């Protein structure tokens, strides 16, 4: 029988010289394969006398265990060396701060709307909503705008087309949020008209509106917030008080002057343009047109089913985008809608 200690020693030396896992398996076959040295010794046990077989078998198994131990240790050493090499190649500085999860933020126009809604809610106004694709009746007729009014022309209003390219029957993209007021007044009359006395209507109507216009201060799609207060004894003095208090709260300053200039709108009478002048800052001393307003025209109330002899009201309309530009000192309206994150992140 071959010297078992020599076989174990040869195996240990052979395994230690290998650094490749495939080569290690090939060397393993020399000792533990089907024709390996240890395997051949085990096969030869049958030729030994019974009195020697037991002793020889035990010695061979001890040698086999020693070879397997050396093999497994070398396998683990090769695996660890490969892992260490990979970690060194892909080394990370674990002391570096991790990447923070990106967080979104509200668009500045949305922030402005939330502020407007909050300020008007504090004095009892509700927020009303309505469709952006509107009927000609609610957009124009209900607002006392006659058939021959220039605002009805395709130069100012987006009319919708049917699938065959023909013009849809009096369906358009709303040019203001006044249709929300008309629909709300009709629903209010339907709900309370039989009671003899209706509760006051106090709403703001924010939303997207559409007009054929596009330059640095105008967009074919923009945001508008209109307001309506209808009740008994509502006056122009109430309108002036609401507007002045809102503007001072919105801009967070008493250092501004509000001016009402006579104007014309078909849905209000009398009508006025609202200007503001700041007494300090970059806009100091400049009058800036900021909104339109007026007492609700009696015809608008009649069309909604409200008696203009008993009830009066006022309405106003702010450009939400215009307020946002003034609030943040932005000169070009288009910047808000170009989707440039470098610009928008400044407001978060």
Swiss-Prot record:
**Molecular function in Gene Ontology:** ATP binding; magnesium ion binding; phenylalanine-tRNA ligase activity; tRNA binding
**Matching CDD domains, A to Z?**
PheRS_alpha_core
Q: Where does Mg(2+) bind?
A: 269
The record's listing under InterPro entries reads: aa-tRNA-synth_II, aa-tRNA-synth_II/BPL/LPL, Phe-tRNA-synth_IIc_asu, Phe-tRNA_ligase_II_N, Phe_tRNA_ligase_alpha1_bac, Phenylalanyl-tRNA_Synthase, tRNA-bd_arm
What is the required cofactor set for this protein? Mg(2+)
Keyword Plastid tagged: no
One GO term (biological process): phenylalanyl-tRNA aminoacylation
Its keywords, alphabetically, are: Aminoacyl-tRNA synthetase, ATP-binding, Cytoplasm, Ligase, Magnesium, Metal-binding, Nucleotide-binding, Protein biosynthesis
Q: How is the cofactor bound?
A: Binds 2 magnesium ions per tetramer.
- Kindly list the places in or outside the cell where this protein is found, as annotated in its UniProt entry: Cytoplasm
Which catalytic reaction applies to this protein? tRNA(Phe) + L-phenylalanine + ATP = L-phenylalanyl-tRNA(Phe) + AMP + diphosphate + H(+)
Q: What is its EC number?
A: 6.1.1.20
Query: Among the entry's GO cellular component annotations, what is one?
Result: cytoplasm
Subunit organization: Tetramer of two alpha and two beta subunits.
Q: Which family does it belong to?
A: Belongs to the class-II aminoacyl-tRNA synthetase family. Phe-tRNA synthetase alpha subunit type 1 subfamily.
Instruction: Tell me what this protein is called.
Output: Phenylalanine--tRNA ligase alpha subunit
Taxonomic lineage of the native organism: Bacteria, Pseudomonadati, Pseudomonadota, Betaproteobacteria, Rhodocyclales
Q: What's the encoding gene here?
A: pheS
